[in-house]
């Protein structure tokens, strides 16, 4: 990501509550400002005020394009996930914007963020130090490729992409990327504890058949709306799942 100029940063700070559509129409008035970059950051701050309130006052946070941010976790759900995992080392194999990783990492001595999109990696590499999370290393790599080569860690987190080739929401693990059902054995050879975040639209009974080492199921609701389904896998396959 290209560094933000002082002029653009000042523009962002002065217009962070303004309508971004109106700002886009006024681009000619600000020849020294990178308007597309400014609009991305202003829109990001406005969404963060609702989704990630603890980041709102940190001026040095960079935000990704709108679609990526809409798909990311909220602070409420990220903090809940962080309450479930602690240890020495963590690997987040589907890093994205890095919200989940940033909160999960607070419970670990070291963490690795893995993401195949170069722009998101650049944003994460900038944001983690701004959040005083200097113990997170950033890897621009495919999550499965990294998994195959990585050394064992205490915990692994995955948030498989839940959209099919037509952009619609999916309800089967086999429609997600990566297909965690096919990776269960490899995942458990690399970590004692695996957390998988899935769509609440998932066919849960089928998912439990495909992931027999699931030890816990957590359904996260915010304001009476089901937001996420979490599966926690361990080394032993339980007889019953709490």
Give, region by region, the residue ranges found by the protein language model.
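Conserved SAM-binding loop of SAM-dependent methyltransferases across substrates and taxa
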Residues: 97-109
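Conserved acidic residues
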Residues: 88, 109, 154, 192
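Conserved class I S-adenosyl-L-methionine
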Residues: 88-96
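S-adenosyl-L-methionine
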Residues: 1-88, 116-155
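Class I S-adenosyl-L-methionine
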Residues: 1-18, 25, 157, 162-242
């Amino acid at each position: 990501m290209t560094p933000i100029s002082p002029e653009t940063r000042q523009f962002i700070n002065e217009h962070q509550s303004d309508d971004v559509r109106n700002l886009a129409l006024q681009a000619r008035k600000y020849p020294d400002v990178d308007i597309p970059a400014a609009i991305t950051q202003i829109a990001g701050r406005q969404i963060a005020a609702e989704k990630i309130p603890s980041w709102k006052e940190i001026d040095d946070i960079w935000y990704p394009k709108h679609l990526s941010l809409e798909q990311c976790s909220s602070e409420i759900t990220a903090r809940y996930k962080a309450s479930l995992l602690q240890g020495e080392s963590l690997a987040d194999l589907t890093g994205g914007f890095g919200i989940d990783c940033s909160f999960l990492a607070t419970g670990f001595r070291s963490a690795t963020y893995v993401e195949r999109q170069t722009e998101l990696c650049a944003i994460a590499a900038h944001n983690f130090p701004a959040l005083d999370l200097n113990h997170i290393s950033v890897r621009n790599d495919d999550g499965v490729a990294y998994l195959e080569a990585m050394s064992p860690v205490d915990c692994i987190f995955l948030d498989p992409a839940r959209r099919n080739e037509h952009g619609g929401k999916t309800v089967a693990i086999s429609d997600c990327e990566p297909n965690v059902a096919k990776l269960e054995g490899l995942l458990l050879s690399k970590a004692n504890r695996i957390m998988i975040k899935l769509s609440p639209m998932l066919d849960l009974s089928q998912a439990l058949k495909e992931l027999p080492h699931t030890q816990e199921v957590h359904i996260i609701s915010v304001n009476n709306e089901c937001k996420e389904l979490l599966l926690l896998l361990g080394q032993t396959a339980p007889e019953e799942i709490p």
